[in-house]
C-alpha cells in the first residue's frame, strides 16, 4: 500500500483471511503498523470491490452508470482496439500511462505497466508521484545530477532534525520508508538530540517527547531556508573542503543568500530574527543534523 511495507500477520480460517495484526516479532517494524494496513481486510472483503472488468452499458451523460461484467479477454481486446485507434488517429503521445501508488509496489504490475507505455510508443508517463512529489526528483536531479539517487535522512544517527511541513503522526512520512515514525522522533530526543517542526499550525506530531513547532506563514519555507543558510555562512559553518569535493557553484549560492538575512525574512515568514539565528545555530552545532 505504501513504501514502508509494514509487516502484517494474517489469521486464516477455512482458507479465508479473518484478521490482520502487526508482526510484533519483525526486527525492523517491531510490531508497528498503521490503521491503513490493519484495516485493509475491509477493502479485501468489501462487497463493492471490483473483481472483474466492467463495461458501461449506458451513456456517460446518464446517471447512475450501469455496468455489465465481461471477461478479461474481452476487456483486453476492446481496450487494445480503442488504444490503437487513438494512436493511429492522433499519434503515440495521445496515450499516457498513469501508475497508481500500489502499482509501484507490485513486482508484477510495475514492469507490465512500464511495458504498456513502451509498446504504445508514448513518452507520457505519470504516477501518483507526479502530483504528490514531483518537486523531489526535480531537486535531486538539480543537486546530484541524476534521478536514480533518492537520499533519505539517516534518522538513526541524527542529533538534530529540522522538519519542514512534515506531519509524521498523520502521514507516516511517505518517501522516508520509516516504521514507527513517532518512536524515531522520540529516539532522537532520547539520545539528547532535538526535533524542530516548521509548520503553519501546531501539528499532532509535536509533543514533549518528540519535538517543538516553530510556526511559519504558508508558502514561505524557502525564505527561511535561505536565511538559515545565510546564518550558517556568516558564522563560518560551511565546510568548504567538503563542498569543494562534492559540490560546485558555492559562490552562486552565497550571492543568492546574501540578500536574505534573518531580519529581511522576518515579515514574510512570521518568524523573528533571533529564532532564525537559533535554528541556524542548533543545526550548525549538532554532531549530525538532518532536514
Where are these regions (language model features)?
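Active-site phosphate/pyrophosphate-binding segments
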Residues: 228, 246-291
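Scaffold signal of the M16-like zinc-metallopeptidase fold and its non-catalytic homologs
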Residues: 45-50, 230-260
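N-terminal export/assembly segments and adjacent metallocofactor-ligating motifs
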Residues: 1-235, 264, 272
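Flexible, glycine/charged-enriched surface loops at secondary-structure junctions
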Residues: 90-94, 238-243, 290
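A general boundary/transition motif marking the beginning of the first structured unit of a protein
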Residues: 104, 216, 241-245, 253, ...
